């Protein structure tokens, strides 16, 4: 980046030239007036809201974890526009240009009614209520003060659109210095880590973006759904300052919470309140004055305070979903171009967080034949369902294969040029090759040990919800809800030119001017 720096004196010198400059996609991408509508099927998932259910015999997952507090990361696969048999071949020249998709609009559909879900822990580390105490709590002789506590999580609606996965951040355990190794039982150092947000990663529900699995060994400080998980939060600062802006074209976010209850943790305090034990009493009476020995306050309580959050009211007046969003200008240099013909949609929505309670008779008896109610004769189950639908407006764009543009794309990601098959084409060799029939038998030579490698998926180690839209595109925008909204919101109309449907501005019709009466 070109920044001014201070010299040895008090004069700031300009940056040295030349300085590499990243171009916006608008500088070399030529947009056409051809638009497509893409849509997915109804996307459904069902599971347990708190944890995976395993088969006892084989440790195989019988019921997956499906929570309203999870990230849903959809990887939308688009068809290659360079393989389209366009009716109007004058749209682009395949020898001098390549076609790409640009995202112009999106609508994330959400089914199911609004509802508030609850999370909790049957052995929650909560010693007492510190909001309205009327007597000082005596230190109990019990070594276990955990209680069965539940609460509703922080309310969160958010989606992030980009052609690369969304980057998340969380706090994790860090490696201590070798020369300053902490003693056992001391608080470990922590550091901020950046990782890709995958489908199923937990979002922040009010206890922060932390690796609870590594930093809460008592397994009772948070609810069951995150006690063995990593809660991630999108790193908006990193994505906004990305030089290319592929991870986030734009986003929408709505969060709200308030503190409902105020509790205190149990256990031995690791960080004592500074008092007379520090520096020969230099901090005596700084934070508190010691009570008399015959008072209950003489055995001072724990200072590990924390609230249980609440997402408060869930209303249809503040919904981010089931409405269209139009992309005119992205926040980064990539103005909606879908490199590699894919789009990543990261979604969190816990305003439809209802958990179904399903009860089944353990004796397999019909309901009409049950004489009286016995709670032990019924088994209770929890299930959570999610329902999504994706709709897109895609604009067909072309990129000229000039030296300046290819140099820019090669510096950004050379795999794009490989996908376009712009490599060196060798001269044809001898058309006759040897082909063995029984190549695997012991009578013939060994087969080639180094077959040509196909291009590996850079995201093969990540978990996404893959949605194939390669055969879900249509030029008939007026036949779909999002397509009609796109045409009407800008006063556009569709017409057919050389067999290809294009979009143009609707001409205005002037009204008849009335003659003024005398």
UniProtKB/Swiss-Prot annotation:
SUPFAM superfamilies: Group I dsDNA viruses
One GO BP: endocytosis involved in viral entry into host cell
Domain of life per record: Viruses
Principal location listed in the UniProt entry: virion
GO molecular-function term, one example from the UniProt record: structural molecule activity
Stored InterPro entries: Capsid_L1_Papillomavir, Capsid_L1_sf_Papillomavir, dsDNA_vir_gr_I_capsid
Compartments reported by the entry: Virion; Host nucleus
Coiled-coil zones: none
UniProt similarity note: Belongs to the papillomaviridae L1 protein family.
Function statement: Forms an icosahedral capsid with a T=7 symmetry and a 50 nm diameter. The capsid is composed of 72 pentamers linked to each other by disulfide bonds and associated with L2 proteins. Binds to heparan sulfate proteoglycans on cell surface of basal layer keratinocytes to provide initial virion attachment. This binding mediates a conformational change in the virus capsid that facilitates efficient infection. The virion enters the host cell via endocytosis. During virus trafficking, L1 protein dissociates from the viral DNA and the genomic DNA is released to the host nucleus.
Protein name (Swiss-Prot/TrEMBL): Major capsid protein L1
Organism of this sequence: Human papillomavirus 14
Gene expressing this chain: L1
């Amino acid at each position: 980046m070109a920044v001014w720096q201070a010299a040895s004196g008090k004069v700031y010198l300009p940056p040295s030239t030349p300085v590499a400059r990243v171009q916006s996609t608008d500088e070399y991408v030529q947009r056409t007036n051809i638009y497509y509508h893409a849509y997915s099927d109804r996307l459904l998932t069902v599971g347990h809201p708190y944890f995976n259910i395993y088969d006892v015999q084989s440790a195989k997952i019988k019921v997956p974890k499906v929570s309203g507090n999870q990230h849903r990361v959809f990887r939308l696969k688009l068809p290659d526009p360079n393989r389209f048999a366009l009716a109007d071949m004058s749209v682009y020249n395949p020898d001098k240009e390549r076609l790409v998709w640009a995202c112009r609009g999106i609508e994330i559909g959400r089914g199911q009614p609004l509802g508030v879900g609850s999370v909790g822990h049957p052995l929650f580390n909560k010693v007492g209520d510190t909001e309205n105490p009327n007597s000082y709590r005596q230190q109990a002789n019990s070594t276990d003060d955990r209680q069965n506590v539940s609460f509703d999580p922080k309310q969160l609606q958010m989606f992030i659109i980009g052609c690369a996965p969304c980057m998340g951040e969380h706090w994790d355990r860090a490696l201590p210095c070798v020369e300053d190794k902490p003693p056992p039982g001391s608080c470990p150092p922590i550091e901020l880590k950046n990782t890709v947000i995958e489908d199923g990663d937990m979002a922040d529900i009010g206890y922060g973006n932390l690796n609870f699995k590594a930093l809460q060994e008592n397994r009772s400080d948070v609810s069951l759904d995150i006690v063995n998980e990593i809660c991630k939060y999108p790193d908006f600062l990193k994505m906004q300052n990305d030089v290319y802006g592929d991870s986030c074209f734009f986003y929408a976010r709505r969060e709200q919470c308030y503190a409902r209850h105020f509790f205190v943790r149990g256990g031995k305090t690791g960080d004592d309140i500074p008092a007379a034990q520090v520096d020969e009493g230099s901090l005596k009476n700084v934070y508190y004055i010691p009570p008399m020995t015959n008072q209950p306050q003489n055995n001072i309580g724990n200072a590990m305070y924390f609230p249980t959050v609440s997402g408060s009211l869930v209303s249809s007046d503040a919904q981010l979903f089931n409405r269209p969003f139009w992309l005119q200008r992205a926040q980064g240099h990539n103005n909606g171009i879908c490199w590699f013909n894919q789009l990543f949609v990261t979604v969190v929505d816990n305003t439809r967080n209802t958990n179904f309670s399903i009860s089944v008779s353990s004796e397999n008896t019909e309901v009409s034949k049950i004489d009286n109610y016995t709670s032990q004769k019924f088994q209770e189950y929890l299930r959570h369902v999610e329902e999504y639908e994706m709709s897109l407006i895609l604009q067909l764009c072309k990129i000229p294969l000039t030296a300046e543009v290819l140099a820019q794309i090669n510096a950004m990601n050379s795999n794009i040029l490989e996908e376009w098959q712009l490599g060196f084409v060798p001269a044809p060799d001898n058309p006759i090759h040897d082909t063995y029939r029984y190549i695997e038998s012991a009578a013939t030579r060994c087969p080639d040990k180094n077959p040509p490698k196909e291009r590996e998926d850079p995201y093969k180690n990540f978990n996404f919800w893959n949605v194939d839209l390669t055969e879900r595109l249509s030029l008939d925008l007026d036949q779909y809800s999002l397509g009609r909204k796109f045409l009407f919101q800008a006063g556009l109309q569709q017409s057919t030119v050389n067999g290809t449907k294009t979009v143009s501005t609707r001409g205005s019709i002037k009204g008849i001017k009335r003659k003024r009466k005398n």
